[in-house]
């Protein structure tokens, strides 16, 4: 079963990654075991997030800076965003907001991966490893 690696860029994900790198450099952990830990982190985060209550939040942005749709994942970068939520109040607008939306149904993810075939998955993996994603640092 595949999981999206969206949450590795969060504070928690970055701290885990840094800790695993430190443990690897000290010889306490192998690279393959660190990779398994990150894969389990991805699965666990996706599972826990799906259990959260589904609350609606409204937002309004003055500008849609960029958008992208790739592999059933939408990514939007918005400028000057005002959030409205029935339970909370937000006093000031957010300068920049990145929204990543993906299909949470695992069957569609697996169908997409199998439809791409192994060569496309490998090419995308090489592109991602080469730093082809320009929006990763805009969180």
Curated annotation (Swiss-Prot):
One of its GO terms (cellular component) is transcription factor TFIIA complex. GO terms for biological process: RNA polymerase II preinitiation complex assembly. Keywords: Nucleus, Transcription, Transcription regulation. Pfam families: TFIIA_gamma_C, TFIIA_gamma_N. It is found in: Nucleus. GO terms for molecular function: RNA polymerase II general transcription initiation factor activity; TBP-class protein binding. Residues 113-139 are annotated as: Disordered. It comes from the Eukaryota. InterPro entries: TFIIA_a-hlx (IPR009083), TFIIA_b-brl (IPR009088), TFIIA_gsu (IPR003194), TFIIA_gsu_C (IPR015871), TFIIA_gsu_N (IPR015872). Belongs to the TFIIA subunit 2 family. PANTHER family: TRANSCRIPTION INITIATION FACTOR IIA SUBUNIT 2. This is Transcription initiation factor IIA small chain homolog. It comes from Caenorhabditis elegans. The lineage of its organism: Eukaryota, Metazoa, Ecdysozoa, Nematoda, Chromadorea.
